[in-house]
Structure formats: structure tokens, C-alpha cells
Amino acid sequence: MKRLIVDMDDVLADATGQFIDFYEKEFGVRVSRESMNHKDEMERFPDNHEAVYNFTFRNGFFRTMSVNEHSQEVMKALNKNYEVFIVSSAMEFPNSLAEKFEWLTEHFSFLHWRQFVFCGRKTIVHGDYMIDDLPHNLETFNGEKILFTAPHNLQFNHFKRVDGWKEVGELLLR
């Protein structure tokens, strides 16, 4: 069975939407996804970059992210056809490990906890396919690299790209 590595933030979970929501609650300004296109993390919001970064240290930031559309049904099908592992960087922010684990067990209850890998760097993982939104995670991966579209990666075109979970299903479940 082929091994599939899947990222969590901005792939399964809508981390960008969470930043937008937290920013609006904190500063009273709604930032559109479109305004974030082609911008790295520190440029996506007009002001208060340190405060935006600090959202990730707040209780509930990772636990309350929305699930990306169609990810659950496609992941359920992929789990029947691949050896699936959710691999997420979870060491930088104190609450992220526990919150990510709770989020995954709630929203992807058909996956076993042994399929969750929390790490500091993804260079340690190997597999046949990797789906991630961050190009630097894909660059060192040994298998087929699949870039999941997010506002911060639109300028990259040297990986196979998917624009959502329906496209993931079309690519990997044919």
C-alpha cells in the first residue's frame, strides 16, 4: 500500500481563515483572502504582525479551526486506499500539539491516533505522496510532491498543484 503524507494547517484545517477571524476580533478589520495572495506570513495583514503571530499562542487557536471543504469525505476514501499519515509541525507553539490532536480526533475520527505524527521538521518523513501548502516542506520530500493551494503559495509553480479536496480526490482516487 502506498504511503500518503498529509499536512494539517491550511490543508485539512483552514488556518488562514482562523487568522482572518482572530484579526477581525482583535482589530475590527476584516482582511480578505484575496488581499493575501502572493504574500508571505508577515505581509498578509496590514499591521500588527507580532500580534498576528501571537494568535498561535492563544488557547483555542488550533482547536477551533474550521475543516476545509470536502477534506473529510476525501480523506475517508484515501484512508481505504493508502497508508495515510497526518504530519503536522506542532512543537513551536505550546498549545498546538494537544489542540491539533483533539481537532484531528474530533473531525477525522475514522483515523487512528497512530496515524498522527507531530514533529518539529518534516524532513524526517518519507512516503510516496505528500500534500502540503508550504513549498519548503515539499522540497526535501522523497516522493511525489503535491502543493495544496493557499494564498501564500500562489507564486510557486514547480510542484503539482491541487486547488482543493475535490482535486485531491480526482488525482489520488482514480
Model-derived segments and spans:
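Substrate-recognition "cap/lid" segment bordering the active-site pocket of phosphatases
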Residues: 87-140
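Acidic, Mg2+-coordinating phosphoryl-transfer loop and its flanking beta/alpha structural elements
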Residues: 131-165
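Membrane-proximal envelope and lipid/glycan-remodeling enzymes
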Residues: 83-96, 115, 155-166, 171-173
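Active-site neighborhood of HAD-like aspartate-dependent phosphohydrolases
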Residues: 1-51
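A structural signal for isolated positions on well-ordered beta-strands in alpha/beta enzyme cores
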Residues: 83-85, 129, 146
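Short, acidic loop-to-helix structural element flanking the phosphoryl-transfer center
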Residues: 57-87, 93-98
